[in-house]
Amino acid sequence: IAEKLSFIAAEKILDNIDDILEDKATFVDQDHSKATYAPKIQKIEGLIDWTSNAENIIGKINGLYPVPGAFFISSGERYKILKGEISNGIGNPGEVLNDYLEIACGDKKSIKVTEIQRQGKRPQNIGEFMLGSRIRKGHQI
């Protein structure tokens, strides 16, 4: 989403740069009566609840990327999901459905992880990650 917004912002700046340089631009103050406060996002908010529906989980993955990130804990290790997509796999929430890390959600759908980062390690695509991972089909997260 950040990438999409950066392109939109660049286009808007180019559309208005002449007005800005010639002091012809008009600026609108924020209406403070409509402003809201958003508290700082805490790391723990990134913990994935696999009983949630797939849409909410993928929203958390995308919304918290890159920092603090959406994550799960397995065997005492933290794994940050950097990218994923909704799939139609069915299983118990948190169950790994196959050997390329597709994880069941609470709504009879699943999240297929495509990029992941183990705590203290570099980000990896799922193929690289699975070569050295002990997480396999049937594992419960």
PLM regions with names:
Residues 1-87:
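Active-site-proximal loop/hinge segments within enzyme catalytic domains
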